[in-house]
Amino acid sequence: MRTGVIAKKVGMTRLFQEDGRHVPVTVLALEDCQVVSQRTQERDGYFALQVGSGVAKQKNVAKPQREAFAKAEVGLKMKVAEFRVEGEDGLLPVGAAISAEHFIAGQKVDITGYTQGKGFAGAMKRWGFGGLRATHGVSISHRSHGSTGNRQDPGRVFKGKKMAGHMGDRQRTQQNLEVVRTDPERGLIFVKGSVPGTKNSWMLIRDAVKLPLPEGVPFPGAVVEKNAPAKEADAPAADEQKLDDVANEEAVVEEKAADKQTNDTAAPAEETPAEEAPKADDSDAGKEG
C-alpha cells in the first residue's frame, strides 16, 4: 500500500486516443505536493505519511502548524492529509516532492472529495420523490414529500426519514477511476470521467483498494529530483563567469588607458626643451639687435 497524493481539480476536457476516440477526462493538478511528516510503528503505532499541498499565506496558518512546516523544512501548505502505507518500506523522506509519475496510464485509482453544495433542497430534488398529484384535491402540496410518520404509535418520526434539507457538500469517494494520462512536467493527472467536487477543490487520490496494484508502478513513490533542473543550477556559475570576464576586460581597458595617459604626459616633457630653445634664441636675437 503506497501513499496517496493531494491534487486540485482544474476542470474537465477531452483527450483523443490513437484510434480516434475522444475520452472525457478530469484534469487534476499537483501543486507542490510534499511529505510533511512520518508516522512510525515505534512512536505512533502505525506507518503513515502526512502530505501537504498548495501554498498558503502566513496569516492563514496557525503558529503550531507553521512550526511543524519549519521543522520539516517545507513551505506553508493549504491542505494536509494523512495516508497509511505498507510498512517501513512505504515511507518517503520528509520534504520529498511527489511527482505526477506516481501513477501510470491505465491504473485505477480512488478519488475522495466534497460534492458540490446545492443548498436547501426539497424532497423531489434531494431524494427523487415524485410529488403529489396536480389536481383532484391537491392545492399547495404538489412538491411536498407526503406523509411524515405514523399516528400515536410510535408517536415519533423515525431517524433517517427522507425529508427536505441541506443537499450536497458531502465527502464522497469515487472508486476505480482510470488514469488516462499523466504530465509530469506540468504536474497534471488526467482521470477518465468526473470526480466529486467543484473547480479548485482539493482531491485525495489513492491506489484502488479493491484492485491489485498494476506492474510498473513506482514503489514507494515517484519523487521529483531536486537536481533535475541542471541548467538552472548552472546558471549562477555561468553568470559569475561572465561577471569575471567583464571585470577582467574592464581592468585591461583601464590599464591601457593609464599607459596611454602616461605616454601622453611624458611626450610633451621631452619636447619642451626643444620648443623653448628657439624661443630663447629669438629673445637673445632681439636683445642683440
Curated annotation (Swiss-Prot):
The modification N5-methylglutamine is found at Q152. Keywords: Methylation, Ribonucleoprotein, Ribosomal protein, RNA-binding, rRNA-binding. Coiled coil: none annotated. One of its GO terms (molecular function) is rRNA binding. Methylated by PrmB. Pfam families: Ribosomal_L3. Signal peptide: none annotated. Belongs to the universal ribosomal protein uL3 family. NCBIfam families: L3_bact. HAMAP family: Ribosomal_uL3_B. One of the primary rRNA binding proteins, it binds directly near the 3'-end of the 23S rRNA, where it nucleates assembly of the 50S subunit. This is Large ribosomal subunit protein uL3. It comes from Erythrobacter litoralis (strain HTCC2594). The gene is rplC.
